[in-house]
């Protein structure tokens, strides 16, 4: 996972390595599911949860003997639940169950004592569904006056206007704009560019999507044939779980150098804490979530051309087939509807104009975004779509011209 690059490379270079401090970690092995039976993988393993510098939460499992990380799942709030399997005789089997689809991952505890099993389970659910705010773990950052200067009148728009397309995509992607990362993963980079939100941080913990966690890297390994100790007797020495020291342990986490470059994550933090004001002139705001209801979307999604255009933006994964039904499930999910509402609020704030300009939207759409007029923005996008010739029509017309030239 790459870290966010500096927005101002002309300043003294600085870097932020990925945080190596685990939010939760405990020794546990994997289990393979065949039919209705789970079989333990006897390898010594470690389950841990880590928050990287892009604010994403990773649920990981690694082989403690080889050090190989076999599972690295990006999880968003309300994606899944970690709970004990009551049908297991030993009582030490737990399952990570995704709320969307049938994806389930089973683990068996390898800690010598059982008294912390339920506490580990509670911490896992807490970290997955209520992740800590970025920077709350002591990661170094830019000084307060630098961040407040960015949020000044005109400063933020000027900064956004000078950002490259790739930086904007990173900003509005998995970790950008109020933590609406689930939506970015849900719809892919093409649609995520228009579906960020600068809503208050209180809503960011619930604005998730089940998608990218399902676009996780599925484990490709099965039960190993190597001779290992019995599951009930983990070795004391080799089973000691590694706990790397946090990268910010040099004592300078709270006093950043004035010349330290402002990082992309700093701007994300600013946008995440921005208050969305009421619409200009007290005009009534349009909530896209109340407009794009499942009933209205159903006939649109039934169109084969629409399906063909949306399919590439669906996540690919073992339990997420790229089908028309999956499009329907995605766009009618509560998470997507909530994200639409948050995007409506952000658009109505009048602060997304510079971003819309960067994405090459028509002048009418940019002007509407600057005014916070959601209805005018939608009409501008609709008019632009009507004025652009369809790819198929252009191709047919070109073929006709070639045929005429041959005659």
Curated annotation (Swiss-Prot):
A GO CC term assigned to this protein in UniProt: nucleus
Chain positions found as Phosphoserine: 15, 140, 211, 405
Keyword hit for Methyltransferase: no
Annotated coiled-coil segments of the chain: none
Residue ranges constituting the Pru domain according to the UniProt record: 18-131
Any one of the GO BP annotations: follicle-stimulating hormone signaling pathway
Post-translational modification: Not N-glycosylated.
Positions where N-acetylthreonine occurs in the chain: 2
Alphabetical UniProt keywords: Acetylation, Cytoplasm, Isopeptide bond, Nucleus, Phosphoprotein, Proteasome, Ubl conjugation
Comp. bias intervals (Low complexity): 196-254
Compartments (UniProt record): Cytoplasm; Nucleus
Domain DEUBAD, residue spans: 277-391
InterPro entries tied to this protein: DEUBAD_dom (IPR044867), Rpn13/ADRM1 (IPR006773), Rpn13/ADRM1_Pru (IPR044868), Rpn13/ADRM1_Pru_sf (IPR038633), RPN13_DEUBAD (IPR032368), RPN13_DEUBAD_sf (IPR038108)
Listed Pfam families: Rpn13_ADRM1_Pru, RPN13_C
Glycyl lysine isopeptide (Lys-Gly) (interchain with G-Cter in ubiquitin) cross-link, renumbered residues: 34
Region of interest (Interaction with UCHL5), residue spans: 362-407
Tissue expression notes: Present in all tissues examined (at protein level).
Main location (coarse class): cytoplasm
Region (Disordered): 196-259, 381-407
Keyword DNA-binding: no
Subunit details: Component of the 19S proteasome regulatory particle complex. The 26S proteasome consists of a 20S core particle (CP) and two 19S regulatory subunits (RP). Interacts with the proteasomal scaffolding protein PSMD1. Interacts with deubiquitinase UCHL5; this interaction activates the auto-inhibited UCHL5 by deoligomerizing it. Interacts with UBQLN2 and ubiquitin.
Domain remark from Swiss-Prot or TrEMBL: The Pru (pleckstrin-like receptor for ubiquitin) domain mediates interactions with PSMD1 and ubiquitin. Preferential binding to the proximal subunit of 'Lys-48'-linked diubiquitin allows UCHL5 access to the distal subunit.
Role played: Component of the 26S proteasome, a multiprotein complex involved in the ATP-dependent degradation of ubiquitinated proteins. This complex plays a key role in the maintenance of protein homeostasis by removing misfolded or damaged proteins, which could impair cellular functions, and by removing proteins whose functions are no longer required. Therefore, the proteasome participates in numerous cellular processes, including cell cycle progression, apoptosis, or DNA damage repair. Within the complex, functions as a proteasomal ubiquitin receptor.
Membership in a protein family: Belongs to the ADRM1 family.
UniProt-recorded name of the protein: Proteasomal ubiquitin receptor ADRM1
Organism of derivation: Mus musculus
């Amino acid at each position: 996972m790459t870290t966010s690059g500096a927005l101002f490379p002309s300043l003294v270079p600085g870097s932020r390595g990925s945080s190596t401090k685990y939010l939760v970690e405990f020794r546990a092995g994997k289990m393979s599911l065949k039919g209705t039976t789970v079989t333990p993988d006897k390898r010594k393993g470690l389950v841990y949860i880590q928050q990287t510098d892009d604010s994403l939460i990773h649920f990981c499992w690694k082989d403690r003997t080889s050090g190989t990380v076999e599972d690295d799942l990006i999880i968003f709030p309300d994606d899944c639940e970690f709970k004990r399997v009551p049908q297991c005789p030993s009582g030490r089997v737990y399952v990570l169950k995704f709320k969307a689809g049938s994806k389930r991952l089973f683990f068996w505890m390898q800690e010598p004592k059982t008294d912390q099993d339920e506490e580990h389970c509670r911490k896992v659910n807490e970290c997955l569904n209520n992740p800590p705010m970025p920077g709350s773990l002591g990661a170094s950052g830019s000084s307060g006056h630098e961040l407040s200067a960015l949020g000044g009148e005109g400063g933020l728009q000027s900064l956004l206007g000078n950002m490259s397309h790739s930086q904007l995509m990173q900003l509005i992607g998995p970790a950008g704009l109020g933590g609406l990362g689930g939506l970015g993963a849900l719809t892919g980079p093409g649609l995520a560019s228009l579906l960020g939100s600068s809503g208050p941080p209180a809503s960011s913990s619930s604005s998730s999507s089940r998608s990218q966690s399902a676009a996780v890297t599925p484990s490709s390994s099965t039960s190993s044939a190597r001779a290992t100790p019995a599951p009930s007797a983990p070795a004391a020495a080799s089973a000691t779980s590694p706990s790397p020291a946090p990268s910010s342990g040099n004592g300078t986490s709270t006093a950043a150098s004035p010349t330290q470059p402002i990082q992309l994550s700093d701007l994300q933090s600013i946008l995440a804490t921005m208050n969305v004001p009421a619409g200009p002139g007290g005009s009534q705001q349009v909530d896209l979530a109340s407009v794009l209801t499942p009933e209205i979307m159903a006939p649109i999604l039934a169109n084969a051309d629409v399906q063909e255009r949306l399919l590439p933006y669906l996540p690919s994964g073992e339990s997420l087939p790229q089908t028309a039904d999956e499009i329907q499930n995605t766009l009618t999910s509560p998470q997507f509807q909530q994200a639409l509402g948050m995007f409506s609020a952000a658009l109505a704030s009048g602060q997304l104009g510079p971003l819309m300009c960067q994405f090459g939207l028509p002048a009418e759409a940019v002007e509407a975004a600057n005014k916070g007029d959601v209805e005018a923005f939608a009409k501008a996008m609709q008019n632009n779509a009507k004025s652009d010739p369809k790819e198929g029509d252009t191709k047919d017309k070109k073929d006709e011209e070639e045929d005429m030239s041959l005659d």
